[in-house]
């Protein structure tokens, strides 16, 4: 279960409530929110969701500084022995920028408009799969 840090008055309590259900915990970071807002919770979550568009509207373009943000989060996780924390990226994910996002540290990509706006969603999913595996094996 992933929640937006901006929506929680006491993120620690939200994390504890989710953990009590036995579910994995994710914390979401909007483009306008500083990574410093979620740093105190990194050792308590399983996933960081990096929003690479402003939430609320599908089909938006990828915000370019998101790649640097993903790299910064990946470095922080590595430097703090928190590499178990997954980095999910949502917003503007396309076949042409997936390699950049994965190379920066994205483990899970959300590609709604690219897949479901396609005439052949199955082929787009296969292309993502092929591209992701070729990137990870290099």
PLM features: residue spans?
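C-terminal helical cap(s) of enzyme catalytic domains, especially alpha/beta-barrels
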Residues: 102, 116-138
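A short hydrophobic/small-residue beta-strand
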Residues: 1, 25, 108-109, 115
